[in-house]
């Protein structure tokens, strides 16, 4: 008996503890349910109030407009004519600057919303056709003339001479004030360009330099330099060693 009583006491204690825990859980769960019920009730009340105010405003908006309805007929007709001008006059233009309305001060002229430059863009963008637009201008700065006065010769010679040709001419001897003489082929080639004066200067300076180099170091007899008159390369050192 003693062993049975010892086992009953712990079992009873466990049952008591379980009952206390269950009662506490029940008490704790009841306030949460009450709070949720209260919140739901408050929400339902608010929704009912909003629906009531909405129906009330709708009823206010839906009230009839006071006043006679006979005066509204001409204004409606004017509005229809304003938005649909073809109802009264089928021959009228579709686009108008001012609506007809009461027909006071109507404007029937149509203004194109797109500027005329848009249509004429291709015509304005094309340059005027000119056959000689891509050709070179043959500007003749100086020409050799035999019937010129002394003042004209000095002026033309100043244009045709350069600093290099002037210094070389002082070394070799006096030169004429006219433009340097050239062959007809050279004149034709130089007249095709605008810088014909600079071409003449370069050719004359090249001739003078060739003459000075030939005088300083004469080559052997019958050399191609003497035949051409304008050597491309002059080997002065080699000619001096051979002599």
UniProtKB/Swiss-Prot annotation:
**What outcome is documented for mutating residue 84 to F in this protein?**
No change in phosphorylation upon BCR activation
What result is annotated for mutating residue 95 to F? Answer: Slightly reduces phosphorylation upon BCR activation
Lipid addition sites, S-palmitoyl cysteine: 25, 28
Which GO CC annotations does the UniProt entry carry? extracellular exosome; membrane raft; plasma membrane
Q: Which InterPro entries match?
A: LAT2
* Chief location category: membrane
Q: Identify the tissues in which this protein is expressed.
A: Highly expressed in spleen, peripheral blood lymphocytes, and germinal centers of lymph nodes. Also expressed in placenta, lung, pancreas and small intestine. Present in B-cells, NK cells and monocytes. Absent from T-cells (at protein level).
UniProt keywords (A-Z) are: Adaptive immunity, Cell membrane, Immunity, Lipoprotein, Mast cell degranulation, Membrane, Palmitate, Phosphoprotein, Signal-anchor, Transmembrane, Transmembrane helix, Ubl conjugation, Williams-Beuren syndrome
Subcellular location, in the record's words? Answer: Cell membrane
Please give the start and end residues of each transmembrane region: 6-26
**PANTHER family assigned to the protein according to its UniProt record, in alphabetical order:** LINKER FOR ACTIVATION OF T-CELLS FAMILY MEMBER 2
Per its UniProt record, which disorder involves this protein? LAT2 is located in the Williams-Beuren syndrome (WBS) critical region. WBS results from a hemizygous deletion of several genes on chromosome 7q11.23, thought to arise as a consequence of unequal crossing over between highly homologous low-copy repeat sequences flanking the deleted region. Haploinsufficiency of LAT2 may be the cause of certain cardiovascular and musculo-skeletal abnormalities observed in the disease.
Q: How does it assemble?
A: When phosphorylated, interacts with GRB2. May also interact with SOS1, GAB1 and CBL.
- What is this protein's name? Linker for activation of T-cells family member 2
The taxonomic lineage of its organism, from the top, reads: Eukaryota, Metazoa, Chordata, Craniata, Vertebrata
């Amino acid at each position: 008996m003693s062993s049975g009583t010892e086992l009953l006491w712990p079992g009873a204690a466990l049952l008591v503890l379980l009952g206390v825990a269950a009662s506490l859980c029940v008490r704790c769960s009841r306030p949460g349910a009450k709070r949720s019920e209260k919140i739901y009730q408050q929400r339902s009340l608010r929704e009912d109030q909003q629906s009531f105010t909405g129906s009330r405003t709708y009823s206010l908006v839906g009230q009839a407009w006071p006043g006679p309805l006979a005066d509204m007929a001409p204004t409606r007709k004017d509005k229809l004519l304003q938005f649909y001008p073809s109802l009264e006059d089928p021959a009228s233009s579709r686009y108008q600057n001012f609506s007809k309305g009461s027909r006071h001060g109507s404007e029937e002229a149509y203004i194109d919303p797109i500027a005329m430059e848009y249509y004429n863009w291709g015509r304005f963008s094309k340059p005027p056709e000119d056959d000689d637009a891509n050709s070179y201008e043959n500007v003749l700065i100086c020409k050799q003339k035999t019937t010129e006065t002394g003042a004209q010769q000095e002026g033309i010679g100043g244009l045709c001479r350069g600093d290099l040709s002037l210094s070389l001419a002082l070394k070799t001897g006096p030169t004429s004030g006219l433009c340097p003489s050239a062959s007809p082929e050279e004149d034709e080639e130089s007249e095709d360009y605008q810088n014909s004066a600079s071409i003449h200067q370069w050719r004359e300076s090249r001739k003078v330099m060739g003459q000075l180099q030939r005088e300083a170091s004469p080559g052997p007899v019958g050399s191609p330099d003497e035949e051409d008159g304008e050597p491309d390369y002059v080997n002065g050192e080699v000619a001096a060693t051979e002599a």
